[in-house]
Amino acid sequence: MAIPSYKVRLETNEPITPNVRKLVFRLEDPKTITYKQGQFVSFMLGTEDGRPIKRSYSIANMETDGVDSTYIEFVISYVEGGKASELFFNAEPGKEMEMTGPFGLLCLTEELPKRVFLVGTGTGVAPYRSMIEQMRTRTDTEFHILFGAQYLEDMFYLDDFKAVALLDHVHFHPCLSREEKPGCFSGYVQHKLAELNPNPETDIAYLCGNPNMVDEVFEMLKDKDFGVKQVKREKYVFSRF
Ligand SMILES: Cc1cc2nc3c(=O)[nH]c(=O)nc-3n(C[C@H](O)[C@H](O)[C@H](O)COP(=O)(O)OP(=O)(O)OC[C@H]3O[C@@H](n4cnc5c(N)ncnc54)[C@H](O)[C@@H]3O)c2cc1C
């Protein structure tokens, strides 16, 4: 089956941390997209040397469902010298682009165990922001959102995560590796996760973002007897083209 492709138009492009911008695109043709919370899309981008490049970005929309959505929101971090980074960071509202998708399996399953750990570093929390409305209604499961960053100023969507964490069954753990701040864990997400005593009998984990973090946490969970199916992973690997 052909992969759906969409023409989208950039609506807003604003900095939300010193290194991350939030971009909102309006669907132009077709006018809507249906996706599952946790999925990503891929952009085909033109470059100066004429060779198109493909880059993927997680859908960060916070909606009750992903049916017939008319817009797509992304959070994109700047990579020094990165082709897509330059393009997105300098894109003006009104710019048209092509994207395909949605792709990916980092989605909440029908059946969930007692506890779900949602672990992300940097823009790797985008899929979890998209899952917020689902978390609200799935009251039989305890959710732990672990957001890792170096400094507090590198974090975003904090109001959304804190708001959902007002519910008894949702817990938000901001983790800072380079500074101490009230209300934040000092250290890496790995260390916070270890403190929560993950148990393969009762828990599953979702890992997203920096490939090294994903590998490290996966190894830690395997040492605690988690099976491959109990750890869902999305690595933000760099593209070779
Ligand atoms: C499934 C998936 C979902 C993704 N979702 C997001 C998302 O929601 N938000 C987001 O910001 N990114 C996301 N990414 C990463 C994104 O697709 C690009 O890889 C990223 O934007 C860098 O592209 P670029 O063209 O700017 O850099 P490139 O031109 O690809 O790279 C430039 C140079 O920087 C190096 N490099 C590339 N990325 C990094 C990095 N992160 N850290 C250090 N060095 C790097 C490369 O090796 C290269 O030397 C995702 C990736 C995948 C696979």
Which sequence ranges carry the predicted segments?
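Reductase modules of NAD(P)H-dependent flavoproteins
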Residues: 2-7, 142, 146-241
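Ferredoxin-reductase
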Residues: 2-93
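A short, basic/flexible loop-to-alpha-helix module at the beginning of a structural domain
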Residues: 101-112
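Conserved S-adenosyl-L-methionine
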Residues: 113, 136-143
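Conserved beta-strand elements of the Class I
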Residues: 117-119, 206
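Ser/Thr-glycine-rich phosphate-binding loops at phosphate-binding pockets of nucleotides
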Residues: 121-125
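Histidine-anchored nucleotide/phosphate-binding helix
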Residues: 127-136
